[in-house]
């Protein structure tokens, strides 16, 4: 049962590969968003 589950995992991950490719960019996006937000408050 476990070997069958492990053999099917790569097929399941193929569907999520675009999401996994985007995931490392999300923290950078939030960092830039926080920087722009602080800059906007500082300029006001």
UniProtKB/Swiss-Prot annotation:
InterPro entries: PSII_PsbK (IPR003687), PSII_PsbK_sf (IPR037270). It is found in: Plastid, Chloroplast thylakoid membrane. The chain crosses the membrane at residues 23-43. It is a single-pass membrane protein. One of its GO terms (cellular component) is chloroplast thylakoid membrane. Its main location: plastid. GO terms for biological process: photosynthesis. It comes from the Eukaryota. SUPFAM superfamilies: Photosystem II reaction center protein K, PsbK. It holds the Pfam family PsbK. Residues 1-7 form a propeptide. Belongs to the PsbK family. One of the components of the core complex of photosystem II (PSII). PSII is a light-driven water:plastoquinone oxidoreductase that uses light energy to abstract electrons from H(2)O, generating O(2) and a proton gradient subsequently used for ATP formation. It consists of a core antenna complex that captures photons, and an electron transfer chain that converts photonic excitation into a charge separation. This is Photosystem II reaction center protein K. The gene is psbK.
């Amino acid at each position: 049962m476990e070997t069958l589950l492990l053999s099917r995992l790569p097929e399941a991950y193929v569907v999520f590969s675009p999401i996994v490719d985007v995931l490392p960019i999300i923290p950078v996006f939030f960092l830039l968003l926080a920087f722009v937000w602080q800059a906007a408050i500082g300029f006001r």
